[in-house]
Amino acid sequence: MTVEYDLYFISMAARLLGMHPQTLRKYERLGLVQPSRTIGSMRLYSREELERLKAIKHLVEDAGINLAGVQRLLSIAEIVARIQPLMRDEPLSPREARRLSQELAQLRRMVGFE
C-alpha cells in the first residue's frame, strides 16, 4: 500500500524526484520553485511543485536546456496560462484587449521576436 501526502519535506521530495536536496535549494534560489515553509523555516513541497520539478528535471537532463533557458520557458508557460482564459469566442472588453496585448508583447520580447 502506497501512502501519498500533500506536502513533502525537502529530503523526501528529493528522494521522490531522484535529485539531491541541494539541487532543490538551487532551483529555489533561481526562482524556479517556491516551496512553502514551516514555522521553523523547513521547506515543504506540494504535489504541484513536485510536478514542476519533474518538468524542470526533464528539460535539463533529457532536453539539455540550461537553467536560464528553463527560466525563460517557465515564464512563457505562465504567460500562456494567463492568456488562455482570454481566448474565447466572446468579444473582449477594451480592458481585456489591452491586457492581452501587453501579455503578447511581453511574450514576444521573451522569445526574441521584438
Predicted regions and their residues:
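Short, surface-exposed loop/turn segments at secondary-structure junctions
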Residues: T38, L67-V70, P91-P94
